Amino acid sequence: MRKIFVFALLAISTVMMAQENRFVIKGEMSSSVLCYSDETVKEVRLEQNVDGQKVVLATSPVLDNRFTFEGEAPKAVELCEISGFDNGTIQLFLEEGVINVGPFDAAYPVGAVIGGTPSNDIYQDYLNLHKQCVKESKERMKAAQESIPVSLKGKPEAELKYTSPVFYVNNMHFKVAIMDFIYSHIDSPVVLYVIKYAMFPTFTTDVIQIFIDALPQDLHGMAMYKELVNEVRSANLKVGSASPDISGLTPDGKSVSLSDFKGKYVFLDFWASWCAPCRREIPYLKQALAYSENCDRLVVLSYSADDDMDDWTECIEANQLVHKNWIHISTLKGWNSEALKLFAVKGIPFTVLIDPNGNVVEFELRGEEMVKRLKSIVDGTNK
């Protein structure tokens, strides 16, 4: 009897643990009629943006104006969206627990109220704050416009004297509200997205960096944290500044990041198989690498702007672009590569020399000058 009781307890415990690691999204529409047609929503999709691509995580039929998603919760909170409407989507944070969406009008999905879990409750608070800021801004502008003397109505330059200060006041009120919200919820992953979508368009990178520095350690492992750090570094990119971190896959599918080589000099080389000027640099790269045969202080990280695997790998093989200190990576997204955007690459070849601390030393080293510079690193005579 005792064994049966213990077994029952274990079974109940296992079921409870399984439930604890799951999410349920319950959605309800007050109307399922679309905005731009008389048709109704038949199916909705739970989607996530992965490396710039929409990935469908699950689908759900709409029955009696209701839909449900259920599954294993991600280890870290992730921003997702529900699509299937013709006038926008519903954004929410995917995490453990029951997430309630609505009731809402399918014609205006962005107006859906979201809640039920910690992150989504905080996210809804942010949406409410944003709506309140917009409402107050409109009220201030309306009051300013009503205060314009009748004799000045219709005279743009004269009207600006009344309305211009309101733009400034509205901007400052919004900034203060956003900073206060972030400070009040600094431990929540939601603030990562508030920083990205509310701070970056209106704040200087110096101010944004202050708030990024204040984020707790347990948020540093989230992909969005890395994205924020990279965006600030990209905006401030110059000699002496910290380099953005970029990642890609080697030809054999291994994931490699620039930060993997911290403690070494990295010669970051943006190129492509179809780029004739890039190919003209190959002999110089080989010459520089020949000096590093017995040295582990230097790595050449060649990031390809190719979008075709065969073109990339065949070029590497045909030109024997192989050395123990030569690493090749790419995302095969061509000019849409995030790495090219972070380093503001406008043309290739484009090179960046990065020191062991991850700071930019020099841009656009090429030819004999590049060989001489890299040789000095290998020899230990660089300054």
Regions found by a protein language model. Name each.
Residues Q19-V169:
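A non-transmembrane, solvent-exposed segment enriched in polar/low-complexity residues
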Residues R280-Y303, D379-T381:
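Conserved helix-turn-beta segment immediately C-terminal to the redox Cys motif
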Residues K262-G263, F270-Q287:
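Conserved redox-active cysteine motifs that mediate thiol-disulfide chemistry
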Residues M224-S259, I327, K372-G380:
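N-terminal "domain-start" segment that seeds a small globular fold
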Residues I246, P349-F363:
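A short, hydrophobic beta-strand/beta-hairpin element that forms part of a small beta-sheet core
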Residues T313-I348, P356:
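Short, internal strand/loop/helix patches
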Residues F85, T89, I99-G102, P109-G111, ...:
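N-terminal targeting signals for export/organelle localization
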Residues M1-V24, G380-T381:
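Bacterial Sec-dependent N-terminal signal peptides
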